[in-house]
From Swiss-Prot:
It catalyses: L-glutaminyl-[peptide chain release factor] + S-adenosyl-L-methionine = N(5)-methyl-L-glutaminyl-[peptide chain release factor] + S-adenosyl-L-homocysteine + H(+). Substrate binds at N205, P206, P207, Y208. Keywords: Methyltransferase, S-adenosyl-L-methionine, Transferase. This is Release factor glutamine methyltransferase. It comes from Pasteurella multocida (strain Pm70). Pfam families: Methyltransf_31, PrmC_N.
């Protein structure tokens, strides 16, 4: 079987997944699987489409295709996912980084850069990423802020925490792979942190889905860890906990940025306001949905 013949076969098999994943790109995924097994570039696979696959390659492709046909996310099958400017390892112990979270990174960068150029930073910029998972948010911030802080003679201290030991280990691997200086710690939210430590900025993409949400039975989330998706109180328990506890770990005029569901913004703003946060605002994602809410502490 040639590259071209296998691609056509894989596209036919994967088309059955369209019902559960309407955004599935069967053409791209068939090429990705070929790239993974043959170790050849996309351009090479397309240019030499009549190349015949070996028996070993066909067996490996059959295994990968079977996993994808069952709905397993392509990121888990490949073991990696692009986020921001980074290539990150992923596993079944972590959420798969999504483009919507880059909105959180963008606005966190805006705040951090303003902080660096203001009188609020004295020698160090400290950032905490709660529920870090793959380390995506923390590492993206490190990639962008390291040159700026070095130029300004400021020490950059970024800490990512996660309750899952395997996620912490994976995040450390991603930091090493991308040659970025970020510390990672196993902790249930703030529990394992030094109570004396203070941060300029706290960011988080916490669990925010209600356990009865029908979307949990659709698409990639069927394979992702429920502990990283689902929260009590109809999805608000972890958000509420973070908003209530964050002031204990923030420097004066520090900020908290939280990602949440697109229909949760009003309730999240209310929780911020009831806890006496200032300048509470919600920011939209690339689809125009309210996705990130921030607040500043006095």
């Amino acid at each position: 079987m040639t590259y071209q013949e296998w691609r056509q076969f894989a596209e036919h098999v994967l088309m059955k997944n369209k019902e559960n994943d309407p955004f599935l790109d069967v053409k791209s995924e068939s090429v990705l699987l070929l790239q993974t097994v043959t170790k050849r570039s996309k351009a090479s696979i397309l240019a030499f489409s009549e190349t015949v696959l070996t028996e070993v390659e066909l067996q490996q492709l059959a295994q990968l295709l079977m996993r994808r046909a069952k709905g397993e996310p392509i990121a888990y099958i490949l073991g990696e996912k692009a986020f921001w400017s980074l290539s990150l390892k992923v596993s079944e112990h972590t959420l798969i980084p999504r483009p919507d979270t880059e909105v959180l990174v963008e606005h966190a960068l805006d705040f951090a850069k303003q902080r660096v150029t203001s009188a609020h930073v004295s020698g160090e910029l400290s950032i905490l990423d709660l529920g870090t998972g793959t380390g995506a948010i923390a590492l993206a911030l490190a990639a962008e802020l390291t040159p700026l802080t070095q130029k300004c003679g400021i020490n950059l201290n970024i800490l990512g925490v996660d309750r899952i030991a395997e996620a912490v280990a994976l995040a450390k691997d991603n930091a090493k792979q991308n040659e970025l200086k970020v510390n990672f710690l196993q902790s249930v939210w703030f529990d394992a942190l030094n109570p004396e430590i203070r941060f300029d900025l706290i960011v988080s993409n916490p669990p925010y889905i209600d356990k009865n949400d029908p979307h949990l039975t659709q698409g990639d989330v069927r394979f992702e860890p429920l502990s990283a998706l689902v929260a009590a109180e109809e999805g608000y328990a972890d958000i509420r906990h973070i908003i209530e506890q964050a002031p204990l770990f923030l420097k004066p005029q520090g900020a908290l940025l939280l990602e949440h569901g697109w229909q949760q913004a009003e309730k999240v703003r209310s929780i911020f306001q009831k806890n006496l946060w200032h300048n509470v605002a919600t920011l939209k994602d690339y689809s125009g949905n309210e996705r990130v809410t921030l607040g500043c502490w006095r």
